[in-house]
A protein has these predicted regions:
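Extracellular (secreted or membrane-anchored) zinc-dependent metallopeptidases
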Residues: 1-48, 54-160
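Surface-exposed, proline-anchored Ser/Thr-rich loop/turn motifs
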Residues: 157-181
Length: 181
């Protein structure tokens, strides 16, 4: 899904690295809005967004301004994601409509999809992927990332009974991982 000249990561550097401070729906942390626009509450959606990239998804505005002009001709490559000419303003404005042409998939003009995990909306309103995005992620998981799939039978009986605790939980500093065999 990434264009050849996009600078996508080298396969040997492949993976997802996510700051521990962005996990959890009851997270007390905030994220600074780029450009000094304030702070956003963290609701655990950043990991979903980043893993979406790992499974082949682009931002819903098609990365205009980064990989091309910021305009309504940019696309994320998914037919059922409405066009947007830029990222959202880190808010939940469901009336925002930056591209007013009729969408072929919907047969009408539809607003920007700020509820989508692949936008930069406030994490409080992110709650969905489109069916097309789900299909692409499944294709990536069954294709280039098929090595992540492992049959259950490959797990030994001893590994099946392992459990662990993270203490204290939640933690904003140091924590311990306790394995129980």
């Amino acid at each position: 899904n990434w264009p050849p000249d996009s600078g996508a990561p080298d396969p040997f550097e492949d993976g997802v690295v996510i700051d521990y401070r962005v996990f959890g729906s009851n997270n007390p942390n905030t994220i600074d809005i780029p450009g000094g626009g304030g702070q956003l509450p963290v609701k655990g959606r950043t990991p979903v967004h980043e893993v979406g990239h790992y499974f082949g998804l682009r931002h819903i505005w098609g990365d205009g301004g980064t990989l091309g002009p910021n305009d309504c001709a940019q696309s994320d490559g998914i037919n059922d994601t409405p066009f947007a000419n830029a990222q959202s303003a880190f808010d939940c404005d469901t009336t925002r409509n930056t591209c007013t042409q009729v969408e072929l998939h919907y047969s009408e003009d539809v607003p920007d999809l700020v509820e989508n995990y692949m936008d930069y909306a406030s994490e409080e309103c992110m709650n969905m992927f489109t069916n097309g995005q789900v299909a692409l992620m499944r294709n990536v998981l069954e294709g280039p990332r098929s090595g992540l799939l492992m049959p259950f039978s490959a797990v030994t009986e001893a590994e099946q009974v392992l459990s662990f605790d993270i203490l204290p939980n939640p933690s904003d500093d140091q924590f311990s991982v306790v394995l129980e065999i």
